[in-house]
Design a protein with these regions (language model features):
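Charge-enriched, short contiguous segments at helix-coil
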Residues: 98-149, 234-237
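N-terminal accessory interaction module
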Residues: 152-232
Length: 237
């Protein structure tokens, strides 16, 4: 049985597609305390001299990581107060962010404290703070320059696909249109309201198709970001 996403997936499976225009913006969270602030608390805890400094440092390192996770989830319109720490890690991994490898070690230390009530050693506390710092640094760029719109073109078919994420309506959309149009806005402005693209899907959380479309969006968004970062490095060499 075909699904609404099938034309989109078939388009993306074509080896002849190339990346085109994309739009970025700086995503700003609305939390009263930032991930960087929690990280600063954790660093101060390590040097506090208190008997429970390692526990405090680990706890604030966890808050720093989780706050950063939730900032990213909000950027992808996936935030929910009911999602647990491990579930957040799984979601970020599905999107394609490098969360698992970095956080698996942290989870072991965190679980020992939160579920076995074993205090961290000074070395474990310092490692946890360092892991939190690494995670925030490695993922910050995704928020400072978040890709919310991008296009991919197939020169053989003369078609392009336009991905767009809308935070106001909590939706992700994908449209296949003719490559003769400069952009999705150009397409929307020039066609009568009765016309539709070759394929259109708009998924809203928690619709079943949303997770699949989000994975496609995240995968190709990260590929665009890696290519852009590589181009910037070449430019500076």
């Amino acid at each position: 049985m075909s699904t609404p996403l099938e034309p989109i997936e078939q388009f993306l499976n074509n080896p002849g597609i190339t990346y085109g225009a994309h739009g970025n913006f700086g995503y700003v969270h609305d939390f009263a305390i930032s991930p960087e602030a929690f990280l600063s608390f954790a660093e101060n805890d390590l040097d506090s001299g208190q008997s429970h400094k390692d526990i405090n440092a680990l706890s604030n390192a966890k808050r720093a990581i989780e706050c950063q996770m939730e900032c990213i989830l909000k950027a992808f319109t996936l935030f929910s107060s009911r999602i647990t720490f491990p579930e957040k890690q799984v979601i970020l991994t599905k999107i394609g962010l490098p969360a698992s490898t970095m956080l698996n070690r942290f989870n072991k230390i965190r679980n020992d404290l939160e579920h076995r009530y074993l205090p961290p050693t000074p070395e474990q506390a310092r490692e946890s703070v360092e892991l939190a710092d690494m995670f925030i640094r490695s993922s910050r760029n995704y928020l400072d320059d978040f890709t919310s719109y991008f296009e991919m073109e197939n020169s053989e078919t003369g078609k392009k696909i336009c991905f767009d994420i809308n935070h106001d309506s909590t939706t992700i959309s994908a449209r296949i249109i003719d490559s003769s149009y400069d952009s999705l806005n150009d397409y929307m402005n020039k066609l009568p309201a009765t016309n539709t693209p070759d394929s259109l899907i708009i998924c809203q959380q928690p619709q079943a198709e949303y997770d699949r479309l989000l994975r496609l969006f995240g995968f190709h968004m990260l590929r665009i970001r890696r290519r852009t970062f590589s181009d910037k490095r070449k430019w500076h060499l």
